[in-house]
Regions:
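Active-site proximal loop and beta-alpha junction motif in alpha/beta enzyme cores
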Residues: 1-260
Length: 260
């Protein structure tokens, strides 16, 4: 029997039970992939992050509740808080790259690569799925980003997840400028093909949303609100090649997981 220390963290959350929950499991050494998938499915969090040290490096492997491996994800914020506590800095190594992180109090900052969106046409089936009239449409691979005119349009979306799941895109992100303090833009993120009707708080989408809004607003420092049911907040700082995402992270649970 294995006895594994694990914790739950609410990421992008100023207080518990907001933002997006991630499980973090401390390991003595790397776990067999099949066993890691089994554990992630049993915990049934959106992501479970397995963390171990090897030759001075902190390695992270993130597995979703459907057993797939996720690269950049909100769980990295929880891992940083778990490893560094309330004050520190370090590097997290993953299969998709290394990410510098630091913590101060309940705030975690992580450096991520910038991703660029391409201009795209608005698919007719997308307008049917959301009943919207976009300002602009961007895409990157299987991700579609739709800009709307007002925050109210984002809030009042009527979603048909059955239709969304039949789109050619794996991810659909809707966003709008927010002209009220303290946020610069808002967003919502739908991914029923990944068994997540609406994502509660995504780190990954900020790698391209921040770039989009930097160009649109001509600002290098931005703040965002993800208008999911649990809401998620964060700040962005832009450099030439990287973005820094700063987000509050709350620890909500710790315990021992016994695995037969």
């Amino acid at each position: 029997m294995l006895a594994l220390n694990y914790s739950l963290y609410d990421c992008f959350a100023q207080m518990p039970f907001q933002g997006h929950t991630a499980a973090v499991i401390d390991l003595v050494q790397k776990l067999d992939h099949g066993l890691a998938v089994k554990i992630a499915k049993e915990l049934c969090q959106t992501v479970t992050c397995f963390v171990w040290n090897d030759s001075g490096h902190t390695w992270v492997k993130t597995i979703s509740k459907d057993g797939s491996v996720w690269p950049i994800n909100h769980g990295l914020l929880g891992v940083a808080r778990n490893c560094l506590g309330v004050q520190g800095n370090g590097v997290l190594d993953t299969v998709s790259g290394s990410f510098e992180v630091r913590t101060k109090g309940n705030t975690v900052t992580i450096s991520l690569p910038k991703l660029k969106l391409d201009i795209a046409e608005m698919p007719e089936r997308l307008t049917q799925a959301f009943d919207i009239m976009p300002v602009s449409v961007r895409e990157m691979g299987k991700t579609c980003v739709v800009e709307l005119r007002t925050v109210e349009e984002i809030i009042n979306l009527e979603t048909d997840f059955n239709r969304i799941s039949k789109l050619d895109y794996d991810r659909v992100v809707l966003t709008a400028e927010d002209d009220t303090v303290p946020f610069d833009y808002v967003c919502r993120y739908f991914s029923p093909k990944h068994n997540i009707n609406e994502n509660n708080g995504s780190l990954y989408i900020q790698t391209f949303l921040a770039v989009f809004w930097q160009e649109r607003l001509q600002k290098n420092n931005l703040s965002f609100l993800q208008l999911s049911p649990r809401r998620a907040i964060g700040r962005i700082s832009m450099s030439e090649k990287l973005i820094e995402v700063e987000a509050p992270v709350c620890k909500t649970f710790e315990g021992v997981l016994k695995v037969l």
